Each structure stands twice: as C-alpha cells, then as structure tokens.
C-alpha cells in the first residue's frame, strides 16, 4: 500500500491455569519451530499476514484517520480464525478486516492437557499515514480478560478482568473527566453524536475498546483481596444469557477550609447493583447513605436551597444530590437513590426509565439541560438513524418552596424535552432543542399533549392556557477541525421580541443564554492532555416565570447552568492522565448579579423569583443588582485504584474569591482555601464552583 505503514501489537490473552499451556497455535511456516519460540513465530506470522492483506478503505484515507483499529478474534478447535469484534467507527474497515481474517489459512489449534482448545487474541492495528517505512512493528503482550475452556474438564481458566457492562445497554457514569477522554474517540468517527449524555456502552464500543483500555491498567494480583481491590467487581455472576455485578460505593473525604469549622468531611457508603438479561435489557441501581459537612461557603449555599422546613425540618439541599436533614453539629444527612432500566429493542431505539440525571451539550456547563440539580424520575427515548439522533425526555420534577407546599407534600411539576442532533457533514453537527414545563394544576397530572414526540411545545403552551406551561427553545452547533480540535456553542431562547432586539434598548423580555467553547485533545502532541476553554452567559430573568413553579428548576436548583441567570462566566480546564495517575485543573471566573438583601425587587439572577417583580422593562443588563465578581480555582491529583469500579484516591485544593459590590450579612467578601483528600467511587461530579 502506497504511503502507508501499519504497526501492530499482537496481544495474547493471559490465563491462570493449574498447568501451563502445552502448545501455542501453529501458523503456516512455524511447523518446524521449537516450542519455546512458537509464540513469537505465531505472532509475527499472523501480524505480517494481516497487515499485508489489508487494503485501507478510501473513507479512512479521505478522513485522514489516525489511531488504532482493535480486532478481537479467536482460533477455534478446528484451527479457524473467527473475528469477534472490530473496534472501528468505519463499517468499511470492519468489512475489510473480516474479509482478511476469513482468508487466513487454518492453523494447528492450541493445546492444553493434550486437548485442542480455543484461544482469544487482540490485534490493535495502528494506522499512521506517511509513516517511516523503516519502523519495525513492536510486539507486546497484554493481560486481557477472556476465558480459555478446556474441552473435557469444563475448566474456566481466568485471572483477568471481566467487565461485562462494556457490552451492555448500561450508561457510562457521567463525569467530565471520563467523558473528555471518551469524546476524543467519538471525534474520529464519521457519524458520531456527542451532545446527549450519558452514553450507553453499546454506543461507546463503536469508537473505543474500553476492554483494551482497562486491561492495560490491570495489576497482576494472585490473591482474592488484591484482585477485588485493584482490578475487579466485588461480586460477579454470569450465566448463559444473564449477568450481575455487586459493588460497594464509598465517598470518604476529609479536609479543612479557613473558616471556624474544625474540619470538613463526607462519609458516603453505598451499594451498586447492575446486570443484564439477554442482550437487549440492562439495569443499574445505586443507593448512597451519606453524612457530610463541607466548606463554609458550600454549607451556606446548601442551606439557602433548603426545602420547606414545615415539610420535615430539612435544613439544606446538598447541591446536585438531594434534601438533607440535620446531623450532629453543623452537618447533614442526605440519602440518595438512583437507578434505571435500559432496553434496546432494535438498532434504532434505546428506551430508558429511571431516577437519575441527564445532560445535553458539548460543554462543561450546559445552557439547555445539565446535571446540576438532584436526581429525578425520567423516561427517555433515543432514536438513531441515518445522520440523525433524536432524543425525547420526559421528567417528573418538584418545587419544594414553602409557598407551594401543602400538608407537607411538595408541589409536583413536569418537563418534556426533545433534542434533534444532525450530522450535516462529518465535521459539522447542529442540534435543535425544545423544552416545556407545566405544573400539576386542576389535577392535570402528566398532560398527554406533551407525549407527542415531534410537536412544537410553544404551540401547546398557548393552547393549554396562559398558565399552561413555560416553553424554551435552543440551537446547538459543533465543528471538528480535526480529530483533536473542536468548537461548540449553544443558544437558549426563553422569550424574545424581534423588534426590541433590533432597538438594543435592554428589553427585559429578551431572555436568552449563550455558550461558546473549544476543546483540544492530546494537546500539543502530548497524549492524554486535554484542554478546554468556555464562555457562558445568561441575561437577567432567563429561566424564570411569572408563576415561579413553572421556572426551569427542580428542588430549588437550576436545570441548566449552576449560576441560574444574570451572569457572565469564563471556564478553563486541563486534564492529564498517565496510566492510573491523573490530574485536573480548573479555573472559573465570572460576574453575577444577585438580588439586594432586604429588597423585594427581582434583579433577574434568582430563577425562583417572579419576573413581574422586575426592576424595569428597559435598560436591563447582565450583572445588575448586587454585582459580584466570583473566582474559583481547583486543582486535584489522584490515583485510580480500581478500573472496574472507578475507585480513586485523590487530594485537592480549592480557592474561591467572592467579592460582592454591596456587603451585608448575606453577602460578605470572602476568600476561601479548602484542602481535601479522600477515597471515592467516581460515579458523578461534585460541582462547587459557584
């Protein structure tokens, strides 16, 4: 092949058996090789045969593809090559690889205890264009999680990592660090959609081999304790058409800020139960029992979100987690439960029903739908075909303010969202967003009008009455300059009047939010270095409503940006990973307008205030009210203890400067330094950058 050189790593499955493998498979040309050299001969011959036979598809050349195509295959007891998986976003490459392996000659199969056995292998083929033809293929072994079955004894021989969830309909838990790593592989695909999160593992495996990634991190351990601590799920059961895993969850943190608090801590213990029934149905459930006391500014913020105390004496809502009750002195007890069912009846549809969170966007923040609020019940339908991914999402939310709480029961509200993602070209993606919120008034319940997956919600808002609902629309875009660099944006429109926009008179009703950002994967040719810069802004009164129960919120938290509205914000992020070690750095700087203490006027920063209490109809500008400059810097380093459960050791420091223009007992100028260390199962992000 012209101007093309493949380097390949031929990876042998490692097995733990009561005896050593008697004989490696014998490829054509290796018949006379001594047994001790047979493995190297086999790997070299197969690698050469595959590389020399592959004709690189035009699509890869056109897209200037660079990266690995991982081929998982096995040699059966008859000596025939069988391809199990080709990890490539290009179907043409998959077809070509399967063709090549089907044409390989039969070999003498491997032997164990004098019986022919199956053996499985992974062959990652690295494809750099215009590489030096003088380079030599580098052959290495890797511990890979597969089983070798001995024919007569029925013995399963394995000491390596089995991650069955990687081939299920479960979601990869959403954290910014994990998804920034995954997205770089999505960017190499010709028809990937990255905005709707979390991703299912079946979506991810089209672009990246998670098994190979995590097996590369595996520690060689012979004891049960060592394997469970560093490599495996605590409990795993697998049958012919089902599997289950059971793992403990911990989030144990201790720290100190520069306030009068003796120390900060978080003590979370929990359990996660996951599984699959057949190939189409998967489930996950997690329960967390937690007690904690945080840095003083976080405690104050949590108490400012407190639910109606008459409904049960709840002093706080822990940001992103849920309602808390008092625990000992200046601490909180906050249980959280999450879970969902995921069902994929065919290649076009995925259905999910559960109690968790969702995210729409390509940024660190989202102006459309974020994971800032507490978990909520939802039903989601993802439909994928051609260059389209269409998401319908129905959510059951709560308003926990005392004004709407009756007999200790919180007010129920509902939200329906749909998002259309279209890959216009391989590099350009655009998205259309629409969402509506309505309350359970007049025993209205879940209004069937909003079950239509393709209706325009703004029309329904008017057809169901002036207080029928609150609709928002949005537009997104993402452009990939190449596999490593991309830019993205969001435009959110709550309300607007075209004539007033043209006049530029600061009309209050032009309520909108905007985001623009850029990502740089493997920045400056440093592998696993990720950089991101982002700007977010929302005009005053965005996401609010004259009937506050119809605002864009849940459990006294914004369903979009953490800061609500009436702000400008800049975000800079750097992530770096080396093996099991990682480091993250984040800087957030912005300006936000708060309401003035003792003043009932709404300045547009609190989405739970009635916008009819606004300052004026014109001259409305971002930062009005108690203008406050906010700076948050966060640095964290850590070590991944267990790739299967994402258990991490970490230490970090957070610095926060909060500088309001008008000082009061509620708004004080503060400089906070918060040191923290801990051990946690990293299944979600803590967002304390407010």
Give the residues covered by each predicted segment:
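Generic short beta-strand segments
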Residues: 105-106, 248-254, 654-656
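Outer-membrane beta-barrel channel domains
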Residues: 149-429, 436-440, 503-512, 519, ...
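Residue-level preference for beta-strand/loop junctions
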Residues: 63-67, 117-119, 265, 333, ...
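Exposed, low-structure sequence patches enriched in small/polar residues
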Residues: 334, 428-690
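Charge-biased low-complexity segments
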Residues: 5-7, 17-147
């Amino acid at each position: 092949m012209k101007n093309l050189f493949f380097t390949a790593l031929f990876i042998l499955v490692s097995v733990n058996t009561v005896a050593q493998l008697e004989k490696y498979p014998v490829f054509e040309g290796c018949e006379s090789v001594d047994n001790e050299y047979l493995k190297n001969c086999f790997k070299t011959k197969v690698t050469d045969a595959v590389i020399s036979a592959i004709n690189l598809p035009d699509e890869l050349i056109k897209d200037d593809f660079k990266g690995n195509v991982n081929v998982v295959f096995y040699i059966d007891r008859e000596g025939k090559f069988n391809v199990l998986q080709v990890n490539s976003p290009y179907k043409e490459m998959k077809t070509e690889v399967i063709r090549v392996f089907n044409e390989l000659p039969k070999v003498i199969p491997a032997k164990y205890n004098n019986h022919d056995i199956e053996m499985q292998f992974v062959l990652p083929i690295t494809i750099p264009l215009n590489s030096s033809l003088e380079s030599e293929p580098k052959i290495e072994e890797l511990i890979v999680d597969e089983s070798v079955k001995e024919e007569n004894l029925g013995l399963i021989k394995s000491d390596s990592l089995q991650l069955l969830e990687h081939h299920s309909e479960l979601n990869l838990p959403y954290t910014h660090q994990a998804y920034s790593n995954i997205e770089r592989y999505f960017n190499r695909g010709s028809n990937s959609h990255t905005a709707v999160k979390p991703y299912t593992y079946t979506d991810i495996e089209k672009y990246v081999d998670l098994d190979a990634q995590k097996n590369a991190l595996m520690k060689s351990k012979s004891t049960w304790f060592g394997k469970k601590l560093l490599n495996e799920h605590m409990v795993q059961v697998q049958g012919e058409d089902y599997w289950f895993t059971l793992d403990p969850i911990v989030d144990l943190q201790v720290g100190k800020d520069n306030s009068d608090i003796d120390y900060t801590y978080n003590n979370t213990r929990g359990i996660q139960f996951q599984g699959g029934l057949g190939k189409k149905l998967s489930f996950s459930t997690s329960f967390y029992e937690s007690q904690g006391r945080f840095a003083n500014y976080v405690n104050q913020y949590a108490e400012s979100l407190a639910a109606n105390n008459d409904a049960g004496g709840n002093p706080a809502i822990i940001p992103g987690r849920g309602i808390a009750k008092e625990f000992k002195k200046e601490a909180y007890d906050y249980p959280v439960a999450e879970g969902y069912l995921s069902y994929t009846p065919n290649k076009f549809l995925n259905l999910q029903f559960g109690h968790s969170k969702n995210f729409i966007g390509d940024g660190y923040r989202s102006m459309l739908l974020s994971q800032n609020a507490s978990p909520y019940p939802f039903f989601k339908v993802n439909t994928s075909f051609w260059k389209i991914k269409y998401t319908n999402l129905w959510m059951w939310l709560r308003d926990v303010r005392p004004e709407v709480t009756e007999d200790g029961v919180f007010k129920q509200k509902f939200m329906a969202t749909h998002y259309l993602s279209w890959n216009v070209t391989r590099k350009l993606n655009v998205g259309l967003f629409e969402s509506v919120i309505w309350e359970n008034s007049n025993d209205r319940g879940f209004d069937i009008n909003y079950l239509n997956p393709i209706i325009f919600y703004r029309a329904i808002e008017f057809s169901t009455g002036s207080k029928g609902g609150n609709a928002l629309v949005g537009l997104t875009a993402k452009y990939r300059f190449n596999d490593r660099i991309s830019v993205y944006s969001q435009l959110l429109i709550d309300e607007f009047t075209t004539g007033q926009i043209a006049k530029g008179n600061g009309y209050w009703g032009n309520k909108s939010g905007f985001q623009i950002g850029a990502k740089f994967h493997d920045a400056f040719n440093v592998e696993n270095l990720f950089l991101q810069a982002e700007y977010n802004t929302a005009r005053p009164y965005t996401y609010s409503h004259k009937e506050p129960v119809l605002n864009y919120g849940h459990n006294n938290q914004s369903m979009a940006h953490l800061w609500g509205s009436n702000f400008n914000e800049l975000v800079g992020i750097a992530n770096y990973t080396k093996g099991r070690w990682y480091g993250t750095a984040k800087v957030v700087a912005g300006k936000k307008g708060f309401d003035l203490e003792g003043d009932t006027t709404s300045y547009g920063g609190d989405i739970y205030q009635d916008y009819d209490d606004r300052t004026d109809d014109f001259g409305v500008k971002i930062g009005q009210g108690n203008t406050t400059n906010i700076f948050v810097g966060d640095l964290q380093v850590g070590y991944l203890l267990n790739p299967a459960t994402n258990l991490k050791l970490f230490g970090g420091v957070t610095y926060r400067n909060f500088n309001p223009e008008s000082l009061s007992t509620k708004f004080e100028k503060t400089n906070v330094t918060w040191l923290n260390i801990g051990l946690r199962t990293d299944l979600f992000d803590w967002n304390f950058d407010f």
